[in-house]
Amino acid sequence: MKLTARQSQVLDIIRRYVDETGYPPTRAEIAAELGFRSANAAEEHLRALARKGAIEMVPGASRGIRLPEAEEDLGLPVIGQVAAGSPILAQEHIEDHCTLQPGFFSPSADYLLRVRGMSMKDIGILDGDLLAVHSTQDVHNGQIVVARVGEEVTVKRFRREGNKVWLIAENEEFAPIEVDLAEQELFIEGLGVGVIRRSDLH
C-alpha cells in the first residue's frame, strides 16, 4: 500500500486521535490540523485512504472512520532529523515506527524523537537515544522539553522567569540557550516523558 505524503499525514492524525482519545477525528479536525480551508479537502483524502485499504469508512457518522486492526499496531512514529521550519510530525521526518504503545509512558507519548548530540548526557540522554515526547505546550520549570527556537529543534531543561526563558543543557560543555520572548520566537513542541536507550533498540 503506497500512500502519498499527504495521505500518510492524514493517517498519522487518525492514529494519534485514536490513541489519545479512543475515537477518530472529525473531518473538520483533520482539516484544521493540516491547514485545509474546508472539511471537504479532508474528505477527499479519507476516500483515497479507504480505496487503498488504509482505513474503513462508516457512512453517516461524523467520526465514521475505522482503522483496520493490523494498522493499529504500528506503534509510535520515530522522528529523525527535523528540517528547519517544518512541522515536527511532517511525513518526511518519520523514519520508522516503534511498536511501544503510547500508554507505556505517563503522560502518554505521541512520538519518539531521535536525540542528536550529547548536550543532555549527564541525565542519561545520549546521542541516538529515542526521547518519548508528549505533545503539549503546557510545561513547567525543570521539565525536559522539545523546543523550537527560530528554526532549530532542541531537547533541553526548561526554565522561565517573566519574558526570559533558559533552555539548559545537562552537560557543562554547553551553555544555556537564553531566549527573550519579547524579541525571539520560541515554540514548545512537547514534554519529554521517557527515554529508550539506543542500545536497547538492537
From Swiss-Prot:
EC number: 3.4.21.88
Site (Cleavage): 84-85
Keyword check for Cell membrane: no
DNA-binding region positions on the chain: 27-47
Reactions catalysed: Hydrolysis of Ala-|-Gly bond in repressor LexA
Top-rank taxon: Bacteria
Entry annotation: catalytic residues: 119, 156
UniProt keyword annotation of Cytoplasm present: no
Subunit structure: Homodimer.
Protein task: Represses a number of genes involved in the response to DNA damage (SOS response), including recA and lexA. In the presence of single-stranded DNA, RecA interacts with LexA causing an autocatalytic cleavage which disrupts the DNA-binding part of LexA, leading to derepression of the SOS regulon and eventually DNA repair.
NCBIfam families: lexA (TIGR00498)
Protein name as it appears in the record: LexA repressor
Lineage, opening ranks: Bacteria, Pseudomonadati, Pseudomonadota, Gammaproteobacteria, Pseudomonadales
